[in-house]
Amino acid sequence: DLLVLGGGRRWCAAIHLGTGALASARWEAPCPPLAPLTLARDTVAVDQHGADPVRPEDVALALPPEPVGRTTRRRAERWLRPVLHPDREHLLGSPGPAVPYWTLTGTAPSLAVVHPPGGVRVARGQARFRWRNVTHALPVLPPALDAAPRRPRRLVVTLSPPRAGHCYKVVAALL
């Protein structure tokens, strides 16, 4: 089972409730994006050929996750706290807004739940926050903007697919 943090029509960032691990679940058949903090049943695909080897959190699902309920932000805390990105480390292992695709080896995370100490500001499709004494302005994916709470405290940062040889940091969910 999954605690969905955010996503799109063919993927979601989630916490696997059985293991507590952060996962980027992907599936073939499109479905409406699941709202953050949705509890969903997953069916892991036997063949993981769709999983990207440089994205250690990738998991291929046989079917889209099936929503079975929702939880509150307060209840989700017990699953979110252990997967928070360490504040001593750069976002996704790199200080800049992008990572050269050829440098990705699968040893650094490609998905992170971030709790910026100064909060998050969202305006004009960008999330602005400070992390390690650097102000970041990352694009927010449209489904995340649609489902954003009024005052987000956390965000889910992931890497975009490669574009011009780089994977860009984007905000996949606002919590």
Where do the protein language model's features map onto the residues?
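Long alpha-helical, hydrophobic tracts
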Residues: D1-R75, W79
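OB-fold/S1-family single-stranded nucleic acid-binding modules
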Residues: T43-W102, A112, R130-L175
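Beta-strand/loop nucleic-acid-binding surfaces
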Residues: R9-A35, V99-H115, G119-V156
